[in-house]
Amino acid sequence: MSTRNPAQSHWGVPKGQRTELYVYNTLTHSKVPFVSNGSNLTWYCCGPTVYDASHMGHARNYVTTDILRRILQSYFGYNITFVQNVTDIDDKIILRARQQYLFEEYKKQQGTNKSHSEAREKVTEAWFAYAKKNLPEPPSSMSEWPQWLASHDIPTLAINNPKLPMHVDALKSALDALQVSEASEIISLDGFWPKVQDVLVPLLDAELGSTVTDPAIFRKLAAYWEDDFNKDMANLNVLPPTAVTRVSEYVPEIVDFVQRIIDRGYAYPVTDGSVYFDTEAFEKGGHFYAKLEPWNKGNRELIAEGEGSLAALTGKKRPGDFALWKASKPGEPSWDSPWSKGRPGWHIECSVMASALLGSNIDIHSGGIDLAFPHHDNELAQSEAYFDCPQWVNYFFHAGHLHIEGQKMSKSLKNFITIKEILKKFTPRQLRLAFLLQQWNTQLDFKETLLAYVLNIEQALENFFRTVRALMNETEGVSANGGHVPEKFDKLEIELLEKFQQTQQNTHLALCDSFNTPLVMQHIDNLVTQANIYIREVGQQPCSRLLGQIASWITSMLQIFGLDENGHPNAVGWSSSKGSSSENTDAMPYIRAVSSFRDRVRELCIAKASSQEILKACDIFRDYDMAALGVSFNDRPQGSALVKLVDAEELIAAREQKLEEERAKQAKKAQAKAEQEKKQVERVMKGKTSPSEMFKMFKEYLSFDEAGLPTKMRGEDGSEIDVPKSRKKKLQKEYAQQEKLHKEYLSYIESNKS
């Protein structure tokens, strides 16, 4: 395994004026002073390889790059020429386009075969070929599949073979489709083909891939996913590039670029018509290879991955050499060149396109950290060989990896979340906030605790903006009506002003420290907390002028970070996540609501209604009419209510929640009352029998006095005897208790007659 022992190359500080800004530069793996030649910057960003949907890893990379670009442009004031490429010639695109085409053609062909026996045979053949290629000790028959699964610990094997679970799932899916189709003797197009696609397309490609010759097949796939990528970036509020370079439009320039490297002695053609970069000759010529990650210089796995899955690799002088031009085989798109009909290597594409627009020295080059070696290291080598210069790029910005709940994302493992999927759960602003809260060049773990923190910060900022807007509107109303608005800064105002000034200074220092946005957001959060404390402590008339300046500055910083695509200068707060402001400027709905309220109050007064009825009408106006318009009235202990403009759906949801809580409270109260009444009835019914009759139902008593108390009873021998004194005393006590209960019973009956 590679280590980081090899020393990195010397990095030269660019010529120009030093500033306060220090940036993390992957060329040194440290923070270095940012030096530019004037106010103009050139920036090349590695764009997408367009063969599939963009995922969260892309979001982290491109939104993070966008944040850095916005800071340099809008905070530090640089004019940036931002060039981003589209890789539309690549082995992944060739394979995906070819396999999709062959799969669709095969489905059409089989659509005329009613028995589909040929399709089952082909999928069965593909199943065994796929298992043989991708499984350790594959089963020799499909009947052995359950035994194979039981005897192999997939999670443990996946530690050294991460793609194994994906292959197992593909085989499971295809086998299930085969078994279902055999049982029913028919093939359901919806159920069969999607399940067998992953195992079938490699076999179709191996047998028929060389027959695919139409260039439009490859371009169609790339064009579709390029458009899809652009839509995702627009949805994420990523600024468009100054220029987009598409590889297919720069092939002649690439051929010329490769020829010049050959002429300088840093590349060599081989017998199959491919051209390779000579890393040994490059270093002997006084250059340094693998500036970014020298410890990976001999990492054959990364080198092979960078060459692509269709690379022939014949005729290379040494393993570390890489392709500048690939001779195309049948079934691969090709262009003319002095060496062969072929296509560009992956790494040369970016070198040529960046140099074509930005020249022999570029201020900033950016991309994901996974591209550092070999892609970016090879870019540097090619360009420095072409220009024979020591430093083609001054600063390399690499966005850190993205993990999901601690797990690495990978397209090949099919465990990635697409941008469209994540935007169904979170807004673009919330995603950007999540990226802002993590230092741009470090690993980000996208997990529930981070998202909960993001939602809390977003809500805290929104509540602060609403309160400040409400206080500013209130002050404007007082002034408009000729009222007095105090402007004096007392102790609390001075303390808040000092906190504001310190936050501005701390924010500047944090941004100068390699764009430390997590620290900036912490400073902003602390300032909001301090401002809220001030509002509570100062009482009825907080200084809306100072609060407005604080809120406006915070808003401007959030706009710089790209958190408000519809923001405008001097705004207080961001627009809603749906793209429209919650402060509706159309006055008619409000006028109509006030007019209707006036009519109701007028009718109540004419009818000489009670004050309670009028207050009820006021509550309806507040909780229903105005809530539907996004207006909140917050009653205060003294004076007028504080008026806020809030999203109507939020107010309605809060009202319904409050009503639901009240209904639950009343239901609980009613249940308690019913239980109490039940107990009362049970007690009352015990007194239904008159005390004068209560003992006459017992046969042991033979005679009674006028009140109904027993005087005679049967003795043990059956003879008549006087009631003993001890018994008489007990009976008198029971009589008194029943007399009390009977009175309660009679009273209850009387009271419930109505």
From Swiss-Prot:
Enzyme Commission number(s) of this protein: 6.1.1.16
Cofactor note: Binds 1 zinc ion per subunit.
Biased composition (Basic and acidic residues): 672-685, 713-725
SUPFAM superfamilies: Anticodon-binding domain of a subclass of class I aminoacyl-tRNA synthetases, Nucleotidylyl transferase
Residues that, per the record, bind Zn(2+): 46, 350, 375, 379
Cofactor: Zn(2+)
Presence of the UniProt keyword DNA damage in the record: no
GO molecular function, one term: metal ion binding
GO term, biological process aspect, one: cytoplasmic translation
Motif ('HIGH' region): 48-58
Catalytic activity: tRNA(Cys) + L-cysteine + ATP = L-cysteinyl-tRNA(Cys) + AMP + diphosphate
This protein's name: Probable cysteine--tRNA ligase
Species whose genome carries this gene: Schizosaccharomyces pombe (strain 972 / ATCC 24843) (Fission yeast)
